[in-house]
Amino acid sequence: MFHEIHRCQHADAPLLVLSSGLGGSSRYWADDLAALTRDHDVLVYDHAGTGRSPADLPADYSIRHMAMELLTLLDSLGIQRCHFMGHALGGLVGLEIALLRPELLQSQVLINAWSSPNPHSARCFSVRKKLLLNSGPDAYVQAQALFLYPADWIAANGARLADDEAHALAHFPGTDNLLRRIHALQTFDVEASLARIQTPTLLIANRDDMLVPWQQSQHLAEALPNARLVLLEYGGHASNITDPLPFQRTLLDFLNAQT
């Protein structure tokens, strides 16, 4: 899989691995790299079947497949210990890795994640799938901002959204791949295994997230043995983009306490 390691200026800096959400592209984290590389080496990657990691995903593709793909990459790089941060679907990958290879994770940060399906998110993804199948990629990509960002941020960032949408269409992963990734996140369920996860975990959620109710993160904070929740008031589903300073401050305070 395509990956990049952005190096900290300090020798022997701890490694932070970033896993993006449904879109799968490492580009999602671009606004955060300057802050994160002050104290950490940062590995970003394009998920299989997205961006610069072309692949035809199998019909039974799952979050476990995604976790195994990332573990294969980390093994190939000789990485034996790291911090992990995942956004939404990327957070599900983190939960799966915490079950498969707990000794790898020094800590994990899960942003607007969940442990099992919920009716609200299921409704959102049903609408998004219908848009993709009935109206095509252009309508799907244009609607994406409505699920990710607060209304005032969308109104103030038209030029950026136009650029992002043009990039998303130019690198569209294909309908089959996208539907299989959506199916993977819709069927993910590790509810019965949460008590086994001992990894120090920070859960970041947003009250105004339209796609994933913040109560999903609250439930994770209650069910994971070594977790705490920080609830941000503003930012939608992607507050690292829409309101980065509170997000980055919360994240770095946690990471620095773990290192």
Swiss-Prot record:
GO molecular function (one): triacylglycerol lipase activity
Recorded superkingdom: Bacteria
UniProtKB keywords: Hydrolase
Pfam families: Abhydrolase_6
EC main group: hydrolase
Lipid biosynthesis in keyword set: no
EC number: 3.5.1.-
GO biological process terms on file: glycerolipid catabolic process; nitrogen utilization; uracil catabolic process
Reactions performed catalytically: carbamate + 2 H(+) = NH4(+) + CO2
Described purpose of this protein according to its UniProt entry: Involved in pyrimidine catabolism. May facilitate the hydrolysis of carbamate, a reaction that can also occur spontaneously.
Sequence similarity: Belongs to the AB hydrolase superfamily. Hydrolase RutD family.
Protein name per Swiss-Prot or TrEMBL: Putative carbamate hydrolase RutD
Protein's organism: Pseudomonas savastanoi pv. phaseolicola (strain 1448A / Race 6) (Pseudomonas syringae pv. phaseolicola (strain 1448A / Race 6))
Origin organism lineage: Bacteria, Pseudomonadati, Pseudomonadota, Gammaproteobacteria, Pseudomonadales
